[in-house]
Amino acid sequence: MDHNIYLIGLNHRSAGVDVRERYALTNVEEFESGLLELGVREVMALSTCNRVEILVVCAPEITQPNILEYWAKRCCGSVSELEPNTYCHDGLNAVKHLFRVACSLDSMIVGEPQILGQLKDSYRKAVEAGAARVIINRMLHKSFFVAKRVRTETSIASSAVSISYAAVELAKKIFGELEGQRAMLIGAGEMAELAATHLLNSGVEQISIANRTYSRAEDLAKCMGGSAVSFDNLYDHLVETDIIISSTGAPHAVISAKEMKKVIKKRKYRPMFFIDIAVPRDIDPDVNGLDNVYLYDIDDLKDVVEENKSQREDEAIKANSIVEFETLSFGNWINSLDLQPTIVDLFNRSENVAQQELAKTLKRLGDVDAKTHKALETMAMSIGKKLLHEPVAFLKRRTEEEGKADEFVDLARRMFNLDNETIPADAHCGRKKNRNPEN
């Protein structure tokens, strides 16, 4: 195999939110482009609130430390900080991990549907940038197929909750009931839309949507029967808001402790609850130090998630079995890639021999008409292909055996001398002398 497959990442289990936000990728396309310039053959990066993962296909001389060093440098961090918080998978372990991510078996909330959409979006961008090619294309399409199988053949999604649902459940734990409370969503993406739905179902009195693109805030507010808020007037509206759920894609905090100090004073110190489900975080952590202001981030949702976990454990076992099967299936395809150049060489050798023998035959026959020439050529080529049919079928079967691909490919290349090695004239002399005449 002349390539390696690596998947390097960090997630909610391996790193806290402070590390995740520091090494989040704010410009995935530029990140991928930089890796291609370093000599990586294919790359796709996924950056969400709970994980950053880099899938790479590269030549053996490019190593995992090379990729970590590039990642740390791009995020103005250090390998010494990044490495202890990451995990690295290679080969089929990388494939298996990707499949688990696609099925949301690796999510904070097992069975949640958002990750598949995020993965598809990352893949689309990698394709558009020319960063995803043969192997990543196949891996991602296979991962979508595996996710579909898991959702069709198990009930893992039926009891799943979303991050947005968990955020609203946390708000309920804080307030008891949400009737009469005024809520604001900062950000107008998919998570905000889901949060708005759950808040309305929980009986909030009023909901407002703040977004940098005001028209998007208006659209979501109209849909949800709420009001849109301009970012320019954000702090004025916070004075009248009890619950804030923030989920923008901003690379920096959008709520500062300095401004919130003024807001809480205007509220006469009535309690405010912020739930920040963005990574990088939207809300300055120092906000939590203000009187009667309570700030929770995405890592605080774990207790809500644990309550839902036991219902999905049996379904997760079934889902993991599907992942294992499809990972082995993908491994067979990878092995066939190693075999493909040898198959091409075999048929080229067969065609060359057929052409040589055809030329000799035509020379002996003398002048023949075009029809006879064509018939002889077809026969010569056909014999070559038919003679190779069984050896090629044998090779395909054998290379599907784990760990056997290189062994059988090497054997075939030597058997048919596809690399044009020079064979000594006396190579078989000893064998002839020792041969038993009775045999």
UniProtKB/Swiss-Prot annotation:
Keywords of the record: NADP, Oxidoreductase, Porphyrin biosynthesis
Record: residues binding NADP(+): G187, A188, G189, E190, M191, A192
Enzyme Commission number(s): 1.2.1.70
Site (Important for activity): H97
Comment, domains: Possesses an unusual extended V-shaped dimeric structure with each monomer consisting of three distinct domains arranged along a curved 'spinal' alpha-helix. The N-terminal catalytic domain specifically recognizes the glutamate moiety of the substrate. The second domain is the NADPH-binding domain, and the third C-terminal domain is responsible for dimerization.
Family: Belongs to the glutamyl-tRNA reductase family.
Role description: Catalyzes the NADPH-dependent reduction of glutamyl-tRNA(Glu) to glutamate 1-semialdehyde (GSA).
Description of how the protein assembles with itself and partners: Homodimer.
Additional remarks: During catalysis, the active site Cys acts as a nucleophile attacking the alpha-carbonyl group of tRNA-bound glutamate with the formation of a thioester intermediate between enzyme and glutamate, and the concomitant release of tRNA(Glu). The thioester intermediate is finally reduced by direct hydride transfer from NADPH, to form the product GSA.
Protein name per Swiss-Prot or TrEMBL: Glutamyl-tRNA reductase
Species the sequence originates in: Maridesulfovibrio salexigens (strain ATCC 14822 / DSM 2638 / NCIMB 8403 / VKM B-1763) (Desulfovibrio salexigens)
Gene name of this polypeptide: hemA
